[in-house]
Amino acid sequence: MVDTTKNTKLFTSYGVSTSRTVSPEMAAKLISKAKRPLLMVGTLTLEPEILDRVVKISKAANIPIAATGSSMASLVDKDVDAKYINAHMLGFYLTDPKWPGLDGNGNYDMVIAIGFKKYYINQVLSAAKNFSNLKTIAIERGYIQNATMSFGNLSKADYYAALDELINAL
């Protein structure tokens, strides 16, 4: 069992609140309870180890994917519900309760972020944190303070093990 709640270091001081660390099992429970979750993936998912796990997460919990950057190209032939959108625009749209969503069925109640550079996803999630009631879970290798919940800072091996635990718990 990987302890994803350790090694949490705050590298910046902006914002009035920071995310809580979350274990893979708790993240899986929260994802399973969400009515309209969205898996937001970045370009780091081009790494085969992460891409494989992203596909498994999407299929295990039947979660649509918002593919950002160049991540869409790797998801085209994976038999998942993926749509392309710019990450910053998605962050903007998620703050609008009347946004119809990527599928036209309404806004989302939870966003799960994976595959982003720390400095990038922190800025995107800042809008959701400060201007909406959206719950966000960052299942990243590093602690993301602007998410509602986040894994702690993990080694690569611990990160892959944590993602596998999350997949098995979904």
Curated annotation (Swiss-Prot):
Heterotetramer of two alpha and two epsilon subunits. The ACDS complex is made up of alpha, epsilon, beta, gamma and delta subunits with a probable stoichiometry of (alpha(2)epsilon(2))(4)-beta(8)-(gamma(1)delta(1))(8). Gene3D superfamilies: TPP-binding domain. Induction: Up-regulated during growth on acetate. GO terms for biological process: methanogenesis, from acetate. InterPro entries: CdhB, DHS-like_NAD/FAD-binding_dom. Part of a complex that catalyzes the reversible cleavage of acetyl-CoA, allowing growth on acetate as sole source of carbon and energy. The alpha-epsilon subcomponent functions as a carbon monoxide dehydrogenase. The precise role of the epsilon subunit is unclear; it may have a stabilizing role within the alpha(2)epsilon(2) component and/or be involved in electron transfer to FAD during a potential FAD-mediated CO oxidation. It comes from Methanosarcina barkeri (strain Fusaro / DSM 804). The keyword Ribosomal protein does not apply. Disulfide bonds: none annotated. This is Acetyl-CoA decarbonylase/synthase complex subunit epsilon 1. Belongs to the CdhB family. Pathway: One-carbon metabolism; methanogenesis from acetate. Keywords: Methanogenesis. SUPFAM superfamilies: DHS-like NAD/FAD-binding domain. NCBIfam families: cdhB (TIGR00315).
